Amino acid sequence: MSKIPQHYPGKKRSAPRHVFIQQAKKKKQTNPAVYHGEDTIEEMDSTEAEQMDTEQATNQTAEAGGGGGGGGGGGGGGGGVGNSTGGFNNTTEFKVINNEVYITCHATRMVHINQADTDEYLIFNAGRTTDTKTHQQKLNLEFFVYDDFHQQVMTPWYIVDSNAWGVWMSPKDFQQMKTLCSEISLVTLEQEIDNVTIKTVTETNQGNASTKQFNNDLTASLQVALDTNNILPYTPAAPLGETLGFVPWRATKPTQYRYYHPCYIYNRYPNIQKVATETLTWDAVQDDYLSVDEQYFNFITIENNIPINILRTGDNFHTGLYEFNSKPCKLTLSYQSTRCLGLPPLCKPKTDTTHKVTSKENGADLIYIQGQDNTRLGHFWGEERGKKNAEMNRIRPYNIGYQYPEWIIPAGLQGSYFAGGPRQWSDTTKGAGTHSQHLQQNFSTRYIYDRNHGGDNEVDLLDGIPIHERSNYYSDNEIEQHTAKQPKLRTPPIHHSKIDSWEEEGWPAASGTHFEDEVIYLDYFNFSGEQELNFPHEVLDDAAQMKKLLNSYQPTVAQDNVGPVYPWGQIWDKKPHMDHKPSMNNNAPFVCKNNPPGQLFVKLTENLTDTFNYDENPDRIKTYGYFTWRGKLVLKGKLSQVTCWNPVKRELIGEPGVFTKDKYHKQIPNNKGNFEIGLQYGRSTIKYIY
C-alpha cells in the first residue's frame, strides 16, 4: 500500500545526525511481541527526514554513541542537550481505499512527573475504618455492600496510560469515524518519550519570605520500563479516569502504579449482640475480624522483572511497533428486539381512509384460520389446541440480549462486589396497568471525571440533577447554599470532590446495542389455576419478586460486545489467564488475543544528597521533570453502508445534554478557557441484525 500523504507538505531542512541514529536503533530492537514487518503506514513522526540505509546509520551509532540501550521491546536514544526530538502532532488522518477506511491517530502530550513520596514499595489495607463505640439498632447497608476495603501494593512508579478514546481523537474525529465506518479494527500502536527535562527545586527563606529556584539538572535521570510480555499485574487506568489527559494543549500527569495484593482476607462483619433488657431489641457494634493468609502473598516488583532504560535530559525512548490481534468492533445499532425477528403475521391493512404511520387508527386485521378460536398457522409456545396464538407466545429463533439477576452480590477474596451484566437501551420491566411503575433491570452506571478529562469548571452540577434526586448526591447544607445562590466554594479545590468532578449518568448505556422489549409479569403465565389478577398492585408485587427469573446468558442468546464510548471509554484490554476465556468485556470493545500493548512505566531516579542513610526516608534533592509523550494509533474500518431510504439522525439516542440547543455552546471554550467534552456513543449506525 502506498504511504499516506502528509497533511502539511513543505520544504524540510536536513535532519541532524542523531535522528538517523535513533532510527537505526528502532530497527535493531528484537522482541517476539513487537511487530517488525514492513511499515505500510508513514513513520510516526511526519517531520522526520527520509530514512538512511540501516548499515550506514549503525556505523554512525558506533561513532556517536547514544543513550540507554533497548529493553523490553523499546530502546533509548541520545538526542543531546539542546536538540529537540520529535514534534507535537494531534491530527487524525482518514484515507478511503475502495471499501476500507484507514485511520491514523497522532497524539502528543506534555507530561509532568514528580518524585513519589517514597521510593519503597508499600503494602497496606485501605478503605475501611472500625468504629467500636457507636451502638446502632439498625445496620447500615455500607457494612455489607458499599465496602471499600482492600489490600494494595503501591509502587514508586508511574504508569503512562493512553488507553482511552479521548487521548487519541477530538470530538469531531470520533464523530467522523463512527459516521464513516460500520466496523473498525485496531492495527498498530507506537509510543515514544521525547524532550526529557529534569529540574531540581531549591527553596530558601529570607525572613518571612520563601523563594524557590528551579535549575536544570543534566545528571538527573528518568527511568523508563516497558512491560512488553505483560508480566506485571494489568491495570488499565480508563475505568478510574486516570489516563493521560484529553486536551492536547493542557499538560497532564501519569497516575501512580499500584495493584491489588491478591492475598486472602477474611471478611469483616459487625458483631451483633442482644441488649440485656426485657424488650427484644438488638444492638450492633462494629467489631471487624481481619485475618490474612500468608500462603497467598504475591509481591511483584518492576526492577526484577523488566529491563529499565535510563534517560537524561535530551534523550528519547521508543516502544517499537505493536501489532494488534483482536476481533473487529461493530459501530452499528439495531432497533430490533426478540419480538421483531422473522416474518410478521399475515394481515389485511385497513383501507377505509388515509392514515399517517404515526396514527393509532392506521391499523390492520390479522388473518386467522377459519373456524378456529383466533388461531394462526405457525410455531407457538403452549399445548392447548384451538386457543389463541399471538405474537406474545410465538417461538422466536433467538433471544436478543439477556438480563442479569440484579442485586445478587457475591463475596470474593477481599470483600463483596457487583457482578453486573450488560445494559441495554431499554432495560426496564413494566407491570401491567395504568399506574404501573418501571422496575429497572441490570445495573445502571455512571462515570466520574475531572477537568483534564472533559470537565468544565463553569458547569453547575446540582442544576443538572432533578430536584427529587438531589438529596442522593448532596447534603442538605449544600442544597440550601445552592438555593440561596451563594457563590461556589472554589478554594482549596478538593481533588475528585463534588467541587472538582463531573458525573455522567447512564454510562456506558451504549454498550447495549439494541432495544429489548419491556417485560410484563403476569401470574397467569406461571401458576396454573389462577385466571385473573388485581391490577396493578398484584402485578407489581409479582414483578418485584420475579426480577431474578429473567432469561440469562445461554446458547440461544445473541449478544453484542460493548461499543466505543467517547471520551472516557477504554479501547483495548487483556484476556485473563484462565482455561475458559470470557466472550466479552464490560469496558473495552477490543480484547487482545495475544499479549496487549505493554504497560509503560516512568520514574525519576533517586537524586541523593551528601547525607546517606538506610532509612525508609533517605535525604533526597527535590526533583521533578516533564517530557513529551507521542503516540500513533492506526485503525482500519469498513465503509458504512446505510440501507434505508430515508435519512437517519444517527445521534438520536444516547447523546448527552451538552448537545441540546441551550447547552451546545459548552463544547467550545468560554472567556476563561473552560469547556465540556460531550459524551458520544460509538454504535450509532442503524442496521438490521436479522
Curated annotation (Swiss-Prot):
<dbReference type="InterPro" id="IPR036952">
    <property type="entry name" value="VP1/VP2"/>
</dbReference>
<keyword id="KW-1162">Viral penetration into host cytoplasm</keyword>
<keyword id="KW-0946">Virion</keyword>
<keyword id="KW-1160">Virus entry into host cell</keyword>
<keyword id="KW-1165">Clathrin-mediated endocytosis of virus by host</keyword>
<keyword id="KW-1173">Viral penetration via permeabilization of host membrane</keyword>
<dbReference type="GO" id="GO:0075512">
    <property type="term" value="P:clathrin-dependent endocytosis of virus by host cell"/>
</dbReference>
<keyword id="KW-1164">Virus endocytosis by host</keyword>
<comment type="function">
    <text>Capsid protein self-assembles to form an icosahedral capsid with a T=1 symmetry, about 25 nm in diameter, and consisting of 60 copies of two size variants of the capsid proteins, VP1 (10% abundance) and VP2 (90% abundance), which differ by the presence of an N-terminal extension in the minor protein VP1. Capsid proteins are responsible for the attachment to host cell receptors. This attachment induces virion internalization predominantly through clathrin-dependent endocytosis. VP1 binds DNA and may therefore play a role in viral DNA encapsidation.</text>
</comment>
<feature type="compositionally biased region" description="Acidic residues">
    <location>
        <begin position="40"/>
        <end position="53"/>
    </location>
</feature>
<dbReference type="Pfam" id="PF00740">
    <property type="entry name" value="Parvo_coat"/>
</dbReference>
<dbReference type="GO" id="GO:0019062">
    <property type="term" value="P:virion attachment to host cell"/>
</dbReference>
<protein>
    <recommendedName>
        <fullName>Capsid protein VP1</fullName>
    </recommendedName>
</protein>
<dbReference type="InterPro" id="IPR016184">
    <property type="entry name" value="Capsid/spike_ssDNA_virus"/>
</dbReference>
<keyword id="KW-0167">Capsid protein</keyword>
<dbReference type="InterPro" id="IPR001403">
    <property type="entry name" value="Parvovirus_coat"/>
</dbReference>
<keyword id="KW-1048">Host nucleus</keyword>
<dbReference type="GO" id="GO:0005198">
    <property type="term" value="F:structural molecule activity"/>
</dbReference>
<dbReference type="GO" id="GO:0042025">
    <property type="term" value="C:host cell nucleus"/>
</dbReference>
<dbReference type="GO" id="GO:0140267">
    <property type="term" value="P:symbiont entry into host cell via permeabilization of host membrane"/>
</dbReference>
<keyword id="KW-1140">T=1 icosahedral capsid protein</keyword>
<keyword id="KW-0945">Host-virus interaction</keyword>
<feature type="compositionally biased region" description="Gly residues">
    <location>
        <begin position="64"/>
        <end position="80"/>
    </location>
</feature>
<feature type="region of interest" description="Disordered">
    <location>
        <begin position="1"/>
        <end position="80"/>
    </location>
</feature>
<keyword id="KW-1161">Viral attachment to host cell</keyword>
<dbReference type="GO" id="GO:0039615">
    <property type="term" value="C:T=1 icosahedral viral capsid"/>
</dbReference>
<comment type="similarity">
    <text>Belongs to the parvoviridae capsid protein family.</text>
</comment>
